Amino acid sequence: MFITFEGIDGSGKSTQIKLLARYLEKRGKRVILKREPGGTETGEKIRKLLLKEEMTPKAELFLFLASRNLLVMEIKRYLSEGYVVLLDRYTDSSVAYQGFGRNLGKEIVEKLNDFATDSLVPDLTFYIDVDVETALNRKGELNRFEKREFLERVREGYLVLAKEHPERIVVLDGKRSIEEIHRDVVREVERRWKLDV
């Protein structure tokens, strides 16, 4: 089982992924929790570079793809060993952030992601949707990925992806309480995989 969580910073996705990991572990599942960019030793170095350096949108995209390619090799291994892999961001982030936010184009970013991941698609993606104002209020400070207009384009990208892939992407209202969102996450996971309770 390969599950990803998506959303703009301040949406609550990192909280929800940790809650789901705890829930699954209590039910005897072996869980691996990873994040993007990062998730591997080299990926974490790339993450530091991405978060502190100004660069062109294309250079940024290629660094994300390099990090993702390394991580996918690990994810495939964990999946083959029967682990549940939970990932904080994946290909949908690149499409939303670089394709829409940085205006590189949805199609080219999707093709490059497909190549970098050997076409590995999550079984399920939770997109936690919040308006930009709410997300910025939760975060408090802005980094270069968080300018208001940019985040509006990113959010639009996520919503486009959710409409295109309703069988995979479940949209959750991120303005609700942590507990309410967690209940919906658990309900969807149980619906799809009939977990032993």
Swiss-Prot record:
Classification via InterPro entries: P-loop_NTPase (IPR027417), Thymidylate_kin-like_dom (IPR039430), Thymidylate_kin_CS (IPR018095), Thymidylate_kinase (IPR018094)
Catalytic activity, EC: 2.7.4.9
MF-aspect GO terms: ATP binding; dTMP kinase activity
Residues that hold ATP according to the record: 7-14
Signal peptide bounds: none
Amino-acid biosynthesis recorded as keyword: no
Pfam families cross-referenced by the UniProt entry: Thymidylate_kin (PF02223)
Cross-referenced CDD domains: TMPK (cd01672)
Family label: Belongs to the thymidylate kinase family.
PANTHER family with a match to the protein in the record: THYMIDYLATE KINASE, UMP-CMP KINASE 2, MITOCHONDRIAL
Identification of the protein by name: Thymidylate kinase
Gene name for this UniProt entry: tmk
